[in-house]
Amino acid sequence: MLVGIGTDIVQIPRIEKILHLYPQLFAKKILTLKELKQFALLDKTNRATFVAKHFAAKEAVSKAFGVGIGQGINFKDITILNDDLGKPIAEVSSNYTKKYSFLNIHLSLSDDYPVCVAFAVVEGGYNVIPV
């Protein structure tokens, strides 16, 4: 069953400015521990695009759940990783997903300076709550 779709677009220069002012603070606000480990390995020229893509991906996934960031799901509830072939994978905190019997999250990311875009489709089944 389709839970929802979501999309987001981010201006990479906007993220560059924020990272210049708050290099670690902003990254720590947006990224999970797994993502921060990847972020730390990047050279400074790739960090803004990395954060912009993760920001857009998390916004798109949250919108696909029908809530948006800050409306029941937060940046730290969603982790964006890549499989061995580079395909983006979204992991969502079990605190948020426990109402679903299963979830499939499909995520597509693209960037072409000065923008990056994310598109997410969430499929799932709801747990039936006995009355």
Swiss-Prot record:
Gene3D superfamilies membership: 4'-phosphopantetheinyl transferase domain
Keyword presence, Transcription: no
Catalyzed reactions: apo-[ACP] + CoA = holo-[ACP] + adenosine 3',5'-bisphosphate + H(+)
Annotated localization: Cytoplasm
InterPro entries membership: 4-PPantetheinyl_Trfase_dom, 4-PPantetheinyl_Trfase_dom_sf, ACPS, Ppantetheine-prot_Trfase_dom
Gene Ontology biological process terms in this record: fatty acid biosynthetic process
Name of this chain's protein: Holo-[acyl-carrier-protein] synthase
The organism of origin for this protein: Rickettsia canadensis (strain McKiel)
